[in-house]
Amino acid sequence: MDNSTPPPGGFKGGLGSIFGGGTPEYSNTELSGVPLTGMSPLSPYLNVDPRYLIQDTDEFILPTGANKTRGRFELAFFTIGGCCITGAAFGTLNGLRMGLSETRDMPWSKPRNVQILNMVTRQGASWANTLGSVALLYSVFGVAIEKARGAEDDLNTVAAGTLTGMVFKSTGGLKGVARGGLIGLAMSGLYALYNNWDHLKGKSPSHY
């Protein structure tokens, strides 16, 4: 019996050798020396050029036709929640200050602690409700104006801020409406100016 192995450049046996269609066998050592001229190395798992997987900037997977910046509706949740948390934190500190001031003549006892705790709870809830209501009005007006105009720019911000101030102070009569509108116009105008400060200085603005 001949136990000799065929040479690396031989042909596969079987049906291929019978019909004369055998394919030559090459070892990995022989294939490793074959130059791949003009070809990029491919990932063995993805079968793509790995250079396409290296991104210099952040890229997000977006649906077709979607914007890379968040709209008014997406920002509304963050705005309302952030204002409620900010109002609660500010109200808590203000209530603690007021409670300590009003009970400074009382000795440290349970009645004083209860009074301070009541003041903290009341002020925190009041400020959270106030700022949350303002944020809700601002978000509703912003989304409505964006849908009506079909565009998202600083004009929407200023208009939404002005209308928010007018509605929030509408219980104070015409003077209250005018005062609230001016306050909303000033605050939204300052925010728009701050948001475009890099653009005014000649730099490319960053959108979030």
Swiss-Prot record:
Keyword Lyase included in the entry's annotation: no
The organism's place on the tree of life at top rank: Eukaryota
Listed InterPro entries: Tim23, Tim23-like
One of the GO biological process terms:
protein insertion into mitochondrial inner membrane
| Subcellular localization, as worded in the UniProt entry | Mitochondrion inner membrane
Which regions span the lipid bilayer? 73-93, 125-145, 173-193
Q: What is its main location?
A: mitochondrion
Query: Any idea which GO molecular function terms this record carries?
Result: protein transmembrane transporter activity; protein-transporting ATPase activity
Q: What is this protein called?
A: Mitochondrial import inner membrane translocase subunit Tim23
